[in-house]
Structure formats: C-alpha cells, structure tokens
Amino acid sequence: MVSFQGKSRTRLKRDGQQWMVDRMIQETGRPFHFQVEGRGRLPRSVRRHVMISKHMGRAAQRMQIIAEEEESVGHMTTALNRYFDASTLYAHAQHVIFENNAEKSYLHAASLRCFDHVRQLAPYRIEHINIDWSGGVLSGNLHLANTTKPAPLVFYIPGCDQTKEMFPHPLLNQALQRDMHIFSFDGPGQGESNLRGIKLTPTNYEEAASAAIDYLISRPEIDPKLLVVYAMSFGSHWGVRIASKDSRVHALAAPWASYCEKYHLLDDEAPRWKQLFMYLTGVTTEADLDEIADAMSVRGMVGAIACPTLLAVGEYDPRSPLEEVYEIFDELTCPAELWVFADQHHAVSLARPNAEANYQSDSHDMALDWLRDRCDGKPMANERQVVYLEPASGHGPYAPAVSRRRRWYEEG
C-alpha cells in the first residue's frame, strides 16, 4: 500500500494519467463523463480530484444550514428540498474517497442524517429498510405510494457513483406519479454497504438483491407479481444479472448502458474508475481486479432473461460500444427493445440533456412509463426492434415515424 493523493491504497498503472484527470476537472467541472457539453456541478475552487470531497462537503454544509433555517421558520417544502440537496452533495463528496476513513464516514453519515429529515418532511411514507444478509446488513429506502390495494414495486438499482438517497426526489417521484412503490437499494459496492465493508464480487449483487426481493414481496402493500427492475448506469449491469437469475422480476428497464465488457470502463475510460473498483472490491492487486472484471461479463447470461426487457444506450458511450450492445441485444430471447440515442454518450436524454440533477433526468419518465405499461399488460411498441432516437427529429420512441434502424447511414 502507498499514499496516493492523501489516501492509502494500491498504486495502479493508470495512476500516471491522474494529471490528465485533474486538468479535465479544472476545465469541465466534472469528475467524469467529460464528453458532455457545459460545465458540471463541481465548485470552481476544485482544481484536482483530491479536492472534491472537501469542497463539495463544504457546499453540502452550507446547504444543510439553509435547510435547518428554513425548517425552523416553518418553510417545510423549502426545507425538504434543501435537505435533499445537502444529502446529495454529501453523498457525492464521500463517493470520491476510495477508502473507509474518517472523512468518508463523516460525509456519508451527514448524507444519511439529511435524508432522515427528507423522510420526515416527505408527503408520503419513506421507510429506511435493513435486511439481514450473509452475516451482514443491506439497506434501502422504500417509498410507498398512497394506494388502497397492493401495487407494483419498482426495484431501483443506482449506479456505482450513486447512493439510494439520490433518487427519487419525494416531490418529483416518477414511480409514485404512476401509482407504483419504489425501493432504492444500496447493494454491495454502494452507499451503506461500502461503509459496512461489504465488498463487491462478480456475483454477490444479484444474490443480495434476491434477498431484498424476498423481504419486499412479503409486504402487504406490494403486488408480488408486479415487481419490476429499473437499473441505471452501472446498475444496468447488475439489473441484467438479476433478471437473468430471478424469475420474480416482471420486467426490466436498463438505460445508460453498462453491460458491455468491463475493460471499456476500467481501461479505456478515465483512470478513476479503476481506482474506484479497487476500493469497491477490496482486492489488493491490479491483476486481481482484472480477473474480477473479466468475471463480471453478462455474455452467456442474457439469454436466460425471460421478462420483457428495455435496453437503452448512447450511440457513442465509451463504456458501451454500440456493436457490442447489439450483440447483447441479439442474445436476448425475451420480448425486448433497444433504444439508441444518436450522438449521445452515457447519460442519455431525449428532452433534458445535461439535467442539473440526476433525479430530473427524463430517462426516469421514459423508463417508468415503459415499466408501467408492462405492469398494465400493454403490448410493446417496438418488440425486437432497435429504435434510433434523434432528438432533433422531434420524435420519441412511441411515434409511428420514429426511425427503426441500427446505424445512422441505414434506411429506417
């Protein structure tokens, strides 16, 4: 172990590229996804990756103070919004620390405390759920719709840079707007699981998710036959694996594709992803991480998925080469459709590119509409089709005139 940017961990071959990441952070205000236009959410005071936790943490502290002041004078809706913002900022601040140290513990605990206020102020019931699993504890937030009979449940799987507190926002809950409950999960490699020392393996996320499903379908509020999985970004990798293993999944929506071979993310993208996964997996050598990454492949698994499935990818997502996504799509034997967002990268959007916050992305609306339709038994609009979405065309995925083709130069 060596000291790297003030943190103790194994030195990696790609660490020599850190100066390029720091330069991109200065120029873009983003810790990753440098392809996106416009400046990101990082404060301009951040000049290096190692500065992110402190400066985002200070921004979170300021937001928390505002939330407390607004709550003290009875402005409860404003307080809820600011507590949610503070919780998210604290969560982003802790994410970039790739070891369990005092700073990460402080920031993550502050995120949870702020979200406790969100739960108390929300216009519906949000339960913090703990589930015993494999000698440890898994956690999730269960957002309960105000329904009088058992309703569908959306099992939400965040990405590897997110926590369960980041989505949904209680005042813009796209699942509840469609009369569905939603459970946001901190599985292995995420949020509370990281702080508890639950390390990620190639297979334990789907095992943990199945344990959570065991509990959730026992709840009287939830219709056990209508449990759908909404898996975003790296969560889409885990969502594909869960759907291939657990027959209780009624439908799967997996946008912001991350199901391709993992060397695209770990070796072709910014080096911070390999640094992150050293922490998430707890391995001590780069060779061990490469072995785990190889074992994460979904090839040969996707054919076992039986439920209706939606995949969505940016045409030029560096972690998800389009031809490889097509190969995975063609392996599916279930009712399935694939949406390709022309000229976009990872965080695809039809109506709100560069949304300021994740919870505002129109990807949530589109995915949850698609899942609600599956719960209602509606036929798929584009079964076994690739839909090529060009925002400039003005057409969404359900328009009769939308293009159905795989490549920009084809007719369709």
Predicted features by range, described:
Residues 150-159:
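Short beta-strand element of the alpha/beta-hydrolase
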Residues 199-221, 241:
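Alpha/beta-hydrolase active-site loop
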Residues 241-291, 307:
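Hydrolase active-site cap/lid region
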Residues 305-306, 311-313:
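Short beta-strand/loop motif that positions the catalytic acidic residue
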Residues 307, 320-330:
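Short alpha-helix in the alpha/beta-hydrolase fold that links the catalytic acid
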Residues 329-349:
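Catalytic histidine neighborhood in serine/cysteine hydrolases
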Residues 354-412:
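Catalytic active-site module of serine/aspartate enzymes centered on a nucleophile-bearing elbow/loop
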